């Protein structure tokens, strides 16, 4: 029997789990607009207070994938998404977007799923627009860009139109809900490999196991002890790794990869223009903490994409494509191709 919204709310009040299949049914009702805003807000609050389980998150993500506009990709080999949940409050330049160009230059197919700013001063969509890229591409155009340039950016609002149903509720609530952790789990291109940053240490193991349940091949879920939702230079980073069907949790430090520690304040920016400037300095191979953190995260992406035998090997590969200019060339090629696809000069 499907669970009713009222029964679901009662479960959360009693700190009892909504089982996977029940969550699937409930989310379908919510995404179809069949549940009132008041009840949606109550259920989201109840889940947050109770703390969402692996089964609840996986069930909800399954439905979000069902309702998304998919990007049809025939070859998923070496494909990776580099994504964060946002909400870490670090206000750094857009590290994951910069790492995308480096990983693509290193041979990965980066299917990046992103949105406008949540925690940083510049979300991935903001950063790409500041770099001159056209971000509002249709699914078939994203697939084309991915095939031609090794990069496909999927602007979340275009791929998840059903999210409009819950947008007013989320906006009025103004607090984190399960939807904040669903976005990174619902890549419309179905990337089997993912480097995911999270905003809380508890999510490292949880999200890795959700990805396991959702059928991902390989994943690294990371949280820096300084609060960053990236592999950090300022502290150790907790890692949940999914590989060969198993999840392993461990901790890494920048010095493990021959990188000097550096506080996250050295990576802070005030707006999209500053983020763009710092990102371009990295792609121009200007030494410093920004270059180091991008090399570290791009190296992790190359590892999870199956293009490096370890994160350390991936970092070396990332540094090589930064040094020879191919990472910067990949940015220029991607921006130009998005204009071609959109019919813009």
Swiss-Prot record:
Chain sites annotated for binding Mg(2+) 1: 96, 230
Residues engaged in binding Mg(2+) 2: 229-230
GO biological process, one term: L-tryptophan biosynthetic process
Residues that, per the record, bind anthranilate 2: 170
UniProt catalytic activity: N-(5-phospho-beta-D-ribosyl)anthranilate + diphosphate = 5-phospho-alpha-D-ribose 1-diphosphate + anthranilate
Keyword Disulfide bond applies: no
Name the UniProt record assigns to this protein: Anthranilate phosphoribosyltransferase
Gene from which this protein is expressed: trpD
E.C. numbers: 2.4.2.18
């Amino acid at each position: 029997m499907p669970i009713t919204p009222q029964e679901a709310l009662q479960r959360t009040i009693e700190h009892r789990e909504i089982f996977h299949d029940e969550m699937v049914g409930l989310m379908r009702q919510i995404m179809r607009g069949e549940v009132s805003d008041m009840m949606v807000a109550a259920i989201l609050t109840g889940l947050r207070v109770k703390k969402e389980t692996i089964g609840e998150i996986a069930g909800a993500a399954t439905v979000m994938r069902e309702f998304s506009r998919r990007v049809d990709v025939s070859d998923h080999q070496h494909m990776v998404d580099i994504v964060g949940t946002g909400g870490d409050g670090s206000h750094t330049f857009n590290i994951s977007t910069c790492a995308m160009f480096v990983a693509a230059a290193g041979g990965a197919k980066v299917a990046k799923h992103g949105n406008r700013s949540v925690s940083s001063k510049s979300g991935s969509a903001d950063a790409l627009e500041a770099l001159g890229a056209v971000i509002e591409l249709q699914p078939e155009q994203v697939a084309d860009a991915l095939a031609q340039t090794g990069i496909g950016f999927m602007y979340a609002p275009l791929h998840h139109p059903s999210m409009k149903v819950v947008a007013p509720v989320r906006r009025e609530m103004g607090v984190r809900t399960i939807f904040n952790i669903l976005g990174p789990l619902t890549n419309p291109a179905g990337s089997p490999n993912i480097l995911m940053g999270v905003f809380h240490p508890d999510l490292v193991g949880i999200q890795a196991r959700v990805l396991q349940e959702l059928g991902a091949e390989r994943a690294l879920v990371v949280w820096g002890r300084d609060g960053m939702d990236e592999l950090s230079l300022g502290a150790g980073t907790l890692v949940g790794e999914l590989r060969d069907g198993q999840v392993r949790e461990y901790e890494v430090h920048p010095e493990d990869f021959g990188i000097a520690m550096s506080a996250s304040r050295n990576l802070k920016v005030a707006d999209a223009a500053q983020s763009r400037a710092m990102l371009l300095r990295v792609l121009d191979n200007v030494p410093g903490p920004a270059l180091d953190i991008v090399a570290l995260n791009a190296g992790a992406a190359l590892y999870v994409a199956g293009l490096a035998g370890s994160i350390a090997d991936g970092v070396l590969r990332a540094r090589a494509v930064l040094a020879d200019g191919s990472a910067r060339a990949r940015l220029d090629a991607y921006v130009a191709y998005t204009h071609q696809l959109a019919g813009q000069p």
